[in-house]
């Protein structure tokens, strides 16, 4: 597939798991002789939640929770059919969300 690229977006709460998965994908793509751009770290999505500690009163007593979503972007340029087959067979951990665009 000359002139094409595969864009892979990875998302996870755990950045170590995310980096491990990105490394696996890059190794698989390079082993099939494809050009790889990345992993490019994208901005971390940070969400704060403020919750009252007490079920009824004491509004001044609150608890804060934070959710961070780490993201990485990998581009595979001019992928061969071997590359696509290898990417389909790769096993990634359950905590990693993978979004692939052709």
Curated annotation (Swiss-Prot):
Q: Which superkingdom does the taxonomy of this entry point to?
A: Bacteria
Q: What does the entry give for GO biological process?
A: translation
Taken from the UniProt entry, a GO cellular component term is: ribonucleoprotein complex
UniProt keyword terms in alphabetical order: Ribonucleoprotein, Ribosomal protein
Q: Which residues form a coiled coil?
A: none
Give a single Pfam family match. Ribosomal_S10
Give the record's family classification: Belongs to the universal ribosomal protein uS10 family.
Q: What does this protein do?
A: Involved in the binding of tRNA to the ribosomes.
Q: What is this protein called?
A: Small ribosomal subunit protein uS10
Question: To which species is this protein native?
Answer: Thermotoga neapolitana (strain ATCC 49049 / DSM 4359 / NBRC 107923 / NS-E)
């Amino acid at each position: 597939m000359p002139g094409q690229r595969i864009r892979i977006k990875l998302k996870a709460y755990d950045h170590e798991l995310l980096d491990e998965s990105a490394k696996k994908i890059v190794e698989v793509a390079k082993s099939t002789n494809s050009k790889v751009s990345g992993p490019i770290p994208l901005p971390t999505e940070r969400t704060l939640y403020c919750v009252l500690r007490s079920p009824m009163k004491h509004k001044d007593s609150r608890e804060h929770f934070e959710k961070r979503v780490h993201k990485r972007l990998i581009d595979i340029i001019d992928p061969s059919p071997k590359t696509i087959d290898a990417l389909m067979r790769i096993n990634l951990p359950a905590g990693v969300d993978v979004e692939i665009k052709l």
